[in-house]
């Protein structure tokens, strides 16, 4: 079952967001377990929403550990972090939950 992680990152400034994002896009491909999909949404001048889908909850948990280390390394740029996770549900037409 696919498992998703969504992380809202709020930065101290626009410059902090840009600095963090540029470091992140260079860092994650070589350090985070393989993802099914990954997207980012800039929700304001000083915040972004990171969304990743993994093949399993176990892979997502491994990714969480690695990503949190990156967040710690870049903490000087961060104001706040909110993280959510759970199984990925289909939103296709007529999708039924069992």
PLM regions with names:
Residues 1-69, 76-98:
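Short S/T/G/P-rich N-terminal loop/turn motif that feeds into the first structured element of a domain
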């Amino acid at each position: 079952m696919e498992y998703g992680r969504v992380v809202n990152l709020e930065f101290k400034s626009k410059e902090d967001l840009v600095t963090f994002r540029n470091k992140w896009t260079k860092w994650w491909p070589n350090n985070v377990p393989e993802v099914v999909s990954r997207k980012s949404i800039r929700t304001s001048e000083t915040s972004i929403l990171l969304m990743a889908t993994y093949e399993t909850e176990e892979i997502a948990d491994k990714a969480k550990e690695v990503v949190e280390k990156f967040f710690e390394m870049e903490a000087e740029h961060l104001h706040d972090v909110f993280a959510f996770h759970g199984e990925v549900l289909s939103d296709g037409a007529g999708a039924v939950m069992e």
